[in-house]
Amino acid sequence: MPIRLAQRSRIAVVEIHGVIGNQVKISEFAHMIDSLSNNQRIRALILDIDSPGGSATGSEVLYRSIQRVAASKPVYAYVRGIGASGGYYLACAASKIYALPTALIGSIGVIYLRPILEQLLTKVGIDFSVYKSGEFKDMTGFWRSPTDRESQKFQGLIDEIFDNFVAVVADGRSLDDSFVRKVATGEVMTAQRGKNCGLVDELGDFKDALEDV
C-alpha cells in the first residue's frame, strides 16, 4: 500500500516508490496526500522516497499537494534508496530530509528526449505530408531533425523548467540560488555528500526519522 500509519502513531507514511507518473500515479497520489491536510487524526507525514524521478509536471503536482499538508502538519522525507530528480523535488517540500548514508540523491536537472526516425522512415520508404498552422506546430515530430530555431525553443523550455527546479531546492533547503546552480549538474551523489552540500539534513534510517518527527 502506498500509504500507511507508522506503528500505532498518528503519523502517516506515504511511499513514493518508483517512477513518478508510472508506478507513482499522479492523480491517485495527489488525492491521497491532499486528504491528509484536513484529517485531524493525522498529526504528521513522512515521505518514504525511493524514486529516480519522472514527469516534471507530475512532480510539481505532488510537490504542491505535499506543501498543502506541510502548511498545517510536520512533514519529513526519508530517502531509502534513491531520491533523484523528481524524487528529490518532492523531498524539498519537507521541513527535514533523512537519508541512508549510501542512498543516492540529487540529479537536479531536466532532460527531454526527442526521437528522430528520419533515416529509418526513409529506409523503409515511408514519407510524411505535413499541414500545419504555425512554424513550430510540428517541432516535436519524429519524422525529421529539429531546425536550429526549434532546438533553441526546446532548450528554452528546458531552461525554464530547470530554473523552477533550482528555485524549489533553494527555497526548500534555504540555500542561495547561485549555490544550488553549482551543485545542480544533473549528477547523483551519496547522501553523505549531499549532507555536506546542504541537500540532506540527517543521515539515518526510517526509524530515526520516525522518532524525530
State the predicted function of each range:
Residues 95-96, 156, 182, 186, ...:
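Well-ordered beta-strand positions
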Residues 76-84, 183-187:
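Glycine-rich beta-to-alpha transition loops that act as phosphate-gripper elements at the mouths
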Residues 120, 168-169, 183, 193, ...:
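Residues within well-ordered alpha helices
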Residues 1-74, 82-172:
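Small-residue-centered hinge/linker elements
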